[in-house]
């Protein structure tokens, strides 16, 4: 995956509702099931399944929908929440597809070029996204898109 795909319309329609954790997990599990079965998929499902394919360590988590919905992922147990992780991949893909904050598409593409891999670049961006979300939540202030973009740009251009 060397380029970012334009999923703008799809993501805007998804942004019009806030899915429950169970709905998010169901979406990922069903997208992965469709991929494995070779069934037709919506573009957003294809994008999700592409990111799941990049994470073989999570394939079992996506294989059993009922278990996925029931399972808890406590922050302190050291196990990453694969659904949160994949949701962050989709969020970053969305940000790039609509270039919001303005300039993120170029910054992520530049970081991917430096890394030689879009997936590795996404993981670096995730660290910034997670930190900025935590900062906003703890301070009670809105998410600072400019600081987020600045962090990505600094990482993309550092020697």
Describe these PLM feature segments:
Residues 39, 62, 99-103, 133-144:
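Long, hydrophobic, amphipathic alpha-helical segments used as structural scaffolds
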Residues 1-9:
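Single conserved hydrophobic/aromatic residue that forms the stacking wall/gate
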Residues 131-134, 138-159:
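Glycine-rich, aromatic-bearing surface loops/beta-hairpins
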Residues 45-111:
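Aromatic-anchored, charged helix-turn/loop surface patch used as a conserved interaction hotspot
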């Amino acid at each position: 995956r060397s380029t970012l795909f334009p999923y703008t319309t799809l993501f805007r329609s998804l942004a019009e509702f806030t899915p429950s954790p169970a709905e998010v997990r169901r979406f990922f599990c069903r997208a992965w099931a469709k991929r494995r079965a070779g069934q037709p998929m919506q573009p957003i499902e294809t994008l999700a399944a592409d990111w799941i394919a990049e994470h073989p360590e999570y394939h079992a988590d996506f294989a059993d929908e009922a278990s996925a919905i029931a399972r808890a992922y406590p922050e302190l147990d050291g196990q990453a929440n694969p659904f949160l992780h994949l949701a962050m991949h989709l969020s970053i893909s969305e940000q790039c597809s609509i270039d919001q904050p303005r300039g993120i598409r170029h910054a992520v593409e530049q970081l991917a070029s430096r890394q030689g891999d879009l997936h590795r670049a996404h993981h670096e961006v995730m660290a910034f996204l997670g930190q900025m979300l935590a900062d906003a939540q703890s301070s009670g202030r809105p998410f600072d898109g400019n600081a987020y973009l600045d962090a990505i740009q600094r990482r993309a251009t550092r020697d």
